């Protein structure tokens, strides 16, 4: 049973691209398989190409993602400043990690978090995160922060619970360049963990 402190704000934090440097590790993995990411949009579909410049289909993308998580989850590098920032924020906030990693790789992600000294409650989710965040906000009743790199997840949360304070955090400059409306749904936009600290502790 998850126990959330009623006396502290709760910070719900994504993992890939927020804690773990997903695209850096994923691109290295793709190159080793004679594949590459072409950075045309904020999506996987249509962006993973083979050495003949042919886009992988949905089934091939699923296989590629699953193989990546199978072999690389425990060794992915961290986003700069993530671990130390969470440690600082945990002094005044209850932290929950909510990731859309496929459920079958949940234990591998737990190992990776522990290996990097990130010891907070961790939950795997599928699809939009709005309902999960709404559930947690109903338990907590206090101030809630939500950090994610996906505008779609920020929108999902705002549609379910408008009082959640949202940060769209995109530390990867290539991904940031693909976002057309950074402040359309989020309360704050950030590309550095030090800015997240300032915003949350302000």
Task: List each model region and its residues.
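Substrate-recognition "cap/lid" segment bordering the active-site pocket of phosphatases
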Residues: 102-145, 151-159
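Active-site neighborhood of HAD-like aspartate-dependent phosphohydrolases
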Residues: 1-63
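Acidic, Mg2+-coordinating phosphoryl-transfer loop and its flanking beta/alpha structural elements
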Residues: 146-191
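Substrate-recognition element of Asp-dependent hydrolases with the DxDx(T/V) motif
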Residues: 73-77, 82-112, 122-125
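Glycine-rich phosphate-binding loop signature in dinucleotide/nucleotide-binding domains
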Residues: 5-7, 91-93, 137-144
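Short, basic/glycine-rich phosphate-binding loops at helix/coil junctions
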Residues: 52-69, 109-115
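Short acidic-hydrophobic, aromatic-tinged amphipathic segments that line or gate anion-handling sites
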Residues: 121-126, 185-196
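Short, charged, surface-exposed secondary-structure boundary motifs
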Residues: 130-135, 175-184, 198-201
């Amino acid at each position: 049973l998850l126990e959330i402190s009623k006396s502290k704000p709760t910070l719900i934090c994504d993992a890939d691209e927020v804690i773990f440097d997903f695209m850096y590790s994923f691109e290295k993995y793709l190159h080793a398989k004679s594949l590459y990411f072409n950075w045309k949009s904020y999506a996987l579909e249509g962006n993973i190409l083979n050495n003949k410049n042919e886009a992988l289909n949905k089934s091939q993308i699923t296989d590629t993602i699953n193989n990546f998580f199978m072999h690389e989850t425990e060794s992915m590098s961290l986003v700069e400043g993530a671990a130390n920032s969470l440690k600082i924020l945990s002094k005044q906030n209850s932290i929950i990690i909510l990731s859309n990693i496929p459920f079958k790789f949940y234990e591998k992600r737990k190992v990776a978090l522990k290996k990097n000294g990130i010891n907070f409650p961790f939950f795997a989710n599928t699809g939009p995160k709005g309902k999960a965040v709404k559930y947690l906000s109903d338990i907590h009743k206090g101030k809630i922060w939500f950090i994610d790199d996906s505008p779609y997840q920020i929108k999902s949360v705002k549609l379910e619970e408008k009082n959640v304070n949202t940060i769209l955090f995109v530390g990867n400059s290539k991904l940031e360049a693909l976002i057309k409306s950074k402040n359309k749904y989020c309360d704050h936009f950030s590309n550095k963990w030090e800015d997240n600290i300032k915003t949350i502790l302000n």
